Amino acid sequence: MKLPGGTIICARNASSYYDTVIVGGGMVGNAMACSLGANKSFQSKSVLLLDAGRSPSLASFKPGAPFNNRVVATSPTSIDTFKKLGVWDQINSHRTKKVNRLFVFDSCSTSEIEFERGQQEEVAFIIENDLIVGSLYEKLAEYKNVDVKTGAKVEDCSIPNALENMATIKLENGDVIETSLLIGADGVNSKVRHASNLDYTTFNYNQHGLVAIVNIETANGKNETAWQRFTTLGPVALLPLSDTVSGLTWSTSPEEAQRLKQLPSDQFVDELNSALFSQNNQIPLVNQTIFALNRMNPFRTETFGRKAEGTTPPHVITVQDKSRASFPLGFGNAHSYITTRCALIGDAAHRMHPLAGQGVNLGWSDVQILDKVLGDAVREGADIGSITYLREYDSAAQKHNLPVMVSVDLLNRLYRTDAPAIVAARAFGLNAFNSLGPVKNFLMNYLSAHR
């Protein structure tokens, strides 16, 4: 039975069938359901979204309401996806913050790099996770071929080895659902991935990501720059949410994250400002060497090797009550994102270091790729659970995701050392790259199109 808003209630212990079942109602799972609902080739196919929780209400994002501590830097390509799905106006009508510049700097040297908007309108938009989820969820009610079941906790999945059988999902309440294609969007600890028996490479960084909402003060009253400073324990980033509020993502050791969460608010703010401004870890010999090498760089400009205006991060004034939380960081990637009657998307397929909140953009790219592949399969009369077509998704998604994931992993490792030789090498490389305007603009455009 279908209720208003797309929610369905199945009779207990009954077995039902859907052409596609998506497990996971987060930012990626909801986007996948919306994409299939909007796909003209998929209108004859039934889609079920299983959400273990409850969708957030958009009423909680009214002006003046506290910001949520989980935010994402949404790339221009992802914004285009939201526009195609018809949810961008809904998201943007509540509260988003445009980022016109990204500034990255080092705690061990004077090296820095700046990305500004060029041909694009913005570097990114900073948006609260739940605002995206809620907007996508509301959109789902418009699609006649999509049903949503909230509070649906998966107990077990069964994925066949051949197309003769269907994939099955058993819920904790006893409901059993069969499907031609099971899409796992159920996060890092994916039950769908576990049931698929797909090989998965994973390791932990021995880091936790500490998030919080902070009130800030800028020199000009505007907060349009995303700031990231690399420290030996991990990067600390401030992502604008309004002219006076930023989201904090602070990667550090598990022990340090726990200590920081328990500090009184004023002490926490003092330590955060120290992490952003302190010069205690600067290596004078490295900075002197960088200065000398910069003078010999044939590509240097008048501002090369010199601090530019507007390169000081905002001063943190207070931290929002009860906004501090932390979670473990790690790397993971399924060797294949597909098997017979099963496809993985988002964190169920891959996991990367947050580094200023970019990871979910890869998940939305997965959605775009898989949506196209499934549309092609339906138009050609194929079985949507066939590896023949799903392999196209796997190939394109792996080719897209792995270079980004490996680059971020290497960058995180490179900046977790204070060895003078490595600090000098990375500092000169960063400053040299910052002076190459055309190359930097090309990279910015490339990353925006591939994240």
Curated annotation (Swiss-Prot):
GO terms for molecular function: 2-methoxy-6-polyprenolphenol 4-hydroxylase activity; 4-hydroxy-3-all-trans-polyprenylbenzoate oxygenase activity; FAD binding; oxidoreductase activity; oxidoreductase activity, acting on paired donors, with incorporation or reduction of molecular oxygen, reduced flavin or flavoprotein as one donor, and incorporation of one atom of oxygen. Keywords: FAD, Flavoprotein, Membrane, Mitochondrion, Mitochondrion inner membrane, Monooxygenase, Oxidoreductase, Ubiquinone biosynthesis. The keyword Calcium does not apply. GO terms for cellular component: extrinsic component of mitochondrial inner membrane; mitochondrion. InterPro entries: FAD-bd (IPR002938), FAD/NAD-bd_sf (IPR036188), Ubi_Hdrlase_CS (IPR018168), UbiH/COQ6 (IPR010971), UbiH/COQ6_monooxygenase (IPR051205), UbQ_mOase_COQ6 (IPR000689). Pathway: Cofactor biosynthesis; ubiquinone biosynthesis. It holds the Pfam family FAD_binding_3. Its EC number is 1.14.15.45, 1.14.15.46. It is an enzyme of class 1 (oxidoreductase). It comes from the Eukaryota. Its cofactor is FAD. The keyword Membrane applies. GO terms for biological process: ubiquinone biosynthetic process. It is a peripheral membrane protein. It catalyses: a 4-hydroxy-3-(all-trans-polyprenyl)benzoate + 2 reduced [2Fe-2S]-[ferredoxin] + O2 + 2 H(+) = a 3,4-dihydroxy-5-(all-trans-polyprenyl)benzoate + 2 oxidized [2Fe-2S]-[ferredoxin] + H2O; a 2-methoxy-6-(all-trans-polyprenyl)phenol + 2 reduced [2Fe-2S]-[ferredoxin] + O2 + 2 H(+) = a 2-methoxy-6-(all-trans-polyprenyl)benzene-1,4-diol + 2 oxidized [2Fe-2S]-[ferredoxin] + H2O. It is found in: Mitochondrion inner membrane. Belongs to the UbiH/COQ6 family. This protein may be expected to contain an N-terminal transit peptide but none has been predicted. FAD-dependent monooxygenase required for two non-consecutive steps during ubiquinone biosynthesis. Required for the C5-ring hydroxylation during ubiquinone biosynthesis by catalyzing the hydroxylation of 4-hydroxy-3-(all-trans-polyprenyl)benzoic acid to 3,4-dihydroxy-5-(all-trans-polyprenyl)benzoic acid. Also acts downstream of coq4, for the C1-hydroxylation during ubiquinone biosynthesis by catalyzing the hydroxylation of 2-methoxy-6-(all-trans-polyprenyl)phenol to 2-methoxy-6-(all-trans-polyprenyl)benzene-1,4-diol. PANTHER family: UBIQUINONE BIOSYNTHESIS MONOOXYGENASE COQ6, MITOCHONDRIAL. Component of a multi-subunit COQ enzyme complex. This is Ubiquinone biosynthesis monooxygenase COQ6, mitochondrial. It comes from Caenorhabditis elegans. The lineage of its organism: Eukaryota, Metazoa, Ecdysozoa, Nematoda, Chromadorea. The gene is coq-6.
